[in-house]
């Protein structure tokens, strides 16, 4: 499905931060058939992954030590206003709002359960231009041990509704925006290693 815009409050982009960018680009291009387009030295090695000339994800050098991590971006009308909303709702601002050339404006946050995510205020780059097809983003899912905190936070910041989904399991929640399903939440039980923090997972 081709996309030309995203409604505010909708997950719209993902990127991978990795300590081995060359290895990651080789792996994902072989797995998904991505064409990797280096954005130039001014972008610090950041690359766009494309299918048929349409951007579907980003890959860049990790900005923090540790294992590779995928970041989910949520479209907003104003990244600066999102900073205030996140603070008010009890989240933590990891990176204040800043411009990405003429592509858009972003900020990075941690929710009260410890999951990191970003917001995206689009200008020339709307986010993923192709979704719900092989090799592209199909789903974003919050994985957390504190679902009640997460429900309160995301409903306040983005206006999401949290709806239990018994068909997907007793601990599964669908996030909806204006009655449209835009993501999910699963509760981490004791089967999850204790060292794994709350995080946003991405599905292709």
Residue ranges of each PLM-predicted region?
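Intrinsically disordered, low-complexity proline/glycine-rich segments
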Residues: 57, 183-185
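Glycine-rich acetyl-CoA-binding "A-motif" of GNAT/NAT acetyltransferases
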Residues: 55, 68, 116
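Core segments of cupin and vicinal oxygen chelate
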Residues: 6-54, 88, 96-104, 108, ...
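Vicinal oxygen chelate
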Residues: 1-7, 10-19, 48-50, 62-85, 87-138, 163-180, ...
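Active-site-flanking structural segment that lines cofactor/substrate pockets
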Residues: 55-61
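Short acidic, gly/pro-rich beta-turn/loop elements at beta-sheet edges
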Residues: 24-26, 59, 82-84, 150, ...
């Amino acid at each position: 499905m081709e996309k030309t815009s995203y409604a505010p409050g909708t997950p719209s982009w993902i990127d991978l931060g990795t300590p081995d960018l060359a290895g990651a680009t080789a792996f994902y291009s072989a797995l998904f058939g991505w064409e990797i387009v280096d954005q130039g030295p001014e972008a610090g090695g950041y690359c766009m992954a494309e299918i048929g000339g349409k951007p579907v994800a980003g890959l860049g050098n990790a900005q923090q030590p540790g294992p590779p991590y995928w970041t989910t971006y949520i479209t907003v009308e104003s990244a600066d206003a999102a900073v205030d909303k996140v603070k008010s709702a009890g989240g933590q601002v990891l990176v204040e709002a800043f411009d990405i050339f003429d592509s858009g404006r972003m900020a990075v946050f941690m929710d009260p359960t410890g999951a990191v995510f970003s917001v995206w205020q689009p200008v020339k780059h709307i986010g993923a231009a192709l979704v719900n097809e092989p090799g592209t983003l199909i789903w974003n899912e919050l994985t957390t041990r504190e679902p009640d905190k997460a429900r309160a936070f995301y409903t306040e910041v983005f206006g999401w509704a949290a709806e239990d989904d018994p068909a997907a399991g007793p601990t599964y929640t669908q996030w909806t925006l204006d009655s449209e399903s835009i993501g999910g939440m699963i509760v981490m039980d004791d089967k999850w290693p204790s060292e794994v923090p709350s995080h946003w997972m991405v599905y292709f």
